[in-house]
Amino acid sequence: MAHLLEKTRKITSILKRSEEQLQDELPYNAITRQLADIIHCNACIINSKGRLLGYFMRYKTNTDRVEQFFQTKIFPDDYVQGANMIYETEANLPVEHDMSIFPVESRDDFPDGLTTIAPIHVSGIRLGSLIIWRNDKKFEDEDLVLVEIASTVVGIQLLNFQREEDEKNIRRRTAVTMAVNTLSYSELRAVSAILGELNGNEGQLTASVIADRIGITRSVIVNALRKLESAGIIESRSLGMKGTYLKVLISDIFEEVKKRDY
């Protein structure tokens, strides 16, 4: 019991991870590594759309084809759909099972390979799946208890992270709306023309050329750019005689200006 309690505490310590620690490209690599070390298995976490959030391999079990899934950080649609249909932990799935993570071409090499899939859901929201696998050793009840705890802990962390991201998006969109509201009619026309000159989110432009084309003064363009830059929506840099380099930092500005029909 003491051994199980110690392992449980290691897993629940995941909740102490800060938001900054979850900003990486694969934010749950450290978590899957911790889980893999505790349970002695390979582990990965995917969200409900199949995006890989983290993984750790203690043992070599996959072919180059499957390794590619981990490199591209996205799982095949049919596998993701199958995982999303699992509502309770499915333990010790054999290599012959459709949801085995062992690829078809390597099943002869790992005939005793076992896969366990635990759904990650919080408050009725399906957030993803926790997948663990071994080459030849069955997952015992103690392992499965830890997997259930881990999926719950990761679910809570995922939900918190998702809410924080939603709040950031709201603040970002609000900042854009407020900045656009400060622009005059002429400045809005200028911003619309400027955004149309960019190659994606950045580009080089000449204010005087744009001003002449849409029939406004150069100072209107300068004022519009200053307002957006002070709001943190764009950044600009003078290129001297070549004009101005402009980069959009918050892409919501494109949609906001489009909504104003300028």
Curated annotation (Swiss-Prot):
NCBIfam families: codY_Gpos, PRK04158.1. InterPro entries: ArsR-like_HTH, CodY, GAF-like_dom_sf, GTP_trans_reg_CodY_C, Transc_reg_CodY_N, WH-like_DNA-bd_sf, WH_DNA-bd_sf. It is found in: Cytoplasm. The keyword Repressor applies. This is Global transcriptional regulator CodY. Residues 1-159 are annotated as: GAF domain. Keywords: Cytoplasm, DNA-binding, Repressor, Transcription, Transcription regulation. Coiled coil: none annotated. The keyword Lipoprotein does not apply. Signal peptide: none annotated.
